């Protein structure tokens, strides 16, 4: 049975892990969200999130955005190659509804997979 959990091993936790992704990454982006990724040696993808106060002022809005992105990653983790991924949220994402945000992030997962495989 396929597991759809989001355990600690699926997260980027340390500053060193985040920093490694910023050096020569594979990119997939839209106007509101950028995905940066590098191949990892694990048997699964890992996710790191950054939602700056500069773009999303209220904590509840930042938490909502992170929750939607984490949930999308959790459900699509088996379709994503073995990459360390950092999601950068930019201006304009706060006005998006959850369904619209989910649709955008799923499109970016596919775009990132194509760039990695192709």
UniProtKB/Swiss-Prot annotation:
GO biological process: tRNA 3'-end processing; tRNA 5'-leader removal
InterPro entries: Ribosomal_Su5_D2-typ_SF, Ribsml_uS5_D2-typ_fold_subgr, RNase_P, RNase_P_CS
One of the record's GO molecular function terms: tRNA binding
UniProt keywords, alphabetically: Endonuclease, Hydrolase, Nuclease, RNA-binding, tRNA processing
Domain of life of the native organism: Bacteria
Broad EC category: hydrolase
Catalyses which reaction(s): Endonucleolytic cleavage of RNA, removing 5'-extranucleotides from tRNA precursor
GO CC annotations on file: ribonuclease P complex
EC numbers for this chain: 3.1.26.5
Function in brief: RNaseP catalyzes the removal of the 5'-leader sequence from pre-tRNA to produce the mature 5'-terminus. It can also cleave other RNA substrates such as 4.5S RNA. The protein component plays an auxiliary but essential role in vivo by binding to the 5'-leader sequence and broadening the substrate specificity of the ribozyme.
Summary of subunit composition and partner proteins: Consists of a catalytic RNA component (M1 or rnpB) and a protein subunit.
Annotated family: Belongs to the RnpA family.
HAMAP family assigned to the protein according to its UniProt record, in alphabetical order: RNase_P
Protein name: Ribonuclease P protein component
Gene: rnpA
